[in-house]
Amino acid sequence: MILAIILFVLLAVSVLANFTQFVSHFTPGKSKMVRSVGPKLDEVYLEDNDAQYKMAVVDIRGIIADQAIGQDGYTAIDLIKAQLKAAQEDRKVKAVILRVDSPGGEVLAADEIKRAIAEFETGEKGKQGKPVIASMGSLAASGGYYVSAPCQWIVANEMTITGSIGVIMDAWNYRGLMDKVGLRPDVYKSGKFKDMLSGSRSTNEIPAGEREMVQKLIDEVYGKFKNVVADGRSAAHEKNGSEGKALVGNWQDYADGRVLSGSEAFQYGFVDQLGNFDDAVKKAKKIANISSANLIQYQQRYDISDLFHLFGKSQAPAIKVDLGMDLPKVEAGHLYYLWRPEK
């Protein structure tokens, strides 16, 4: 009975809102209501210091992927871009703290985030640039470091797992299993490389030069990663001067896919400071040249229409098994900036 009353009230509010919007289209002097593009955000105070200025915290957690994270179809990348845009447009926001706890993920998704951070700092598209300070949690490896590289200042804990600068791609070969069960594929293709990375081929069916082509692609994306590290750390050192850390001369020797502790990353110049989130906040205020600031975060807001969209789902819910751990969802043939320890 109570649930029925709640649903009736929600329905009445929704009908009233839609009616108001409909009438506004035909009322003189009223502007047309337009739904904003991108995720809807609410500003939430994490720490209210009754200050004039603000600093925004943007979280990057888990596997970095360009996948929808809610019923509205927006991806994690959309949400991060929207948060940066809100911080850019708010004159009271003087800096962003990028809180990273991620093993990395998809190459393109990581690059989209890196690009958004770089544009935020340089103030492209006619907007004023603002500093971004990265605060690494327990894990900021591979793509997690990639998105941190363009930040003006990077703080890591001594025990942070970072580094893992490199690219990985899986290609499974199951031809031996197919032979055991009596299966043999018939493939019709337009060129000898059209079924590149197909796992249904035997070793002698793989065309000469295919492995070299795949490795060339890996090396190209790997080179991009190293350029992002070199450019980001060089630009940061120019801004920070003697306060920051410069990459050591042989830094590429440590960019071979190995993981580094926060202490090692500091020693080789991959991070500027050893500390925690509070230290990153203090440094952000110093870089922004402010003595005090309110700490805020932009959280995604869901309105009544989103609620009814959820109730109106017609598809059956998927059955999910909780294994107690967050396993990377890696697909064969995809490029990843990802640290993926074998379990």
Short names for language-model regions:
Residues 2-129, 139-235, 293-343:
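Small-residue-centered hinge/linker elements
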Residues 209-282:
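Flexible, glycine-rich surface segments
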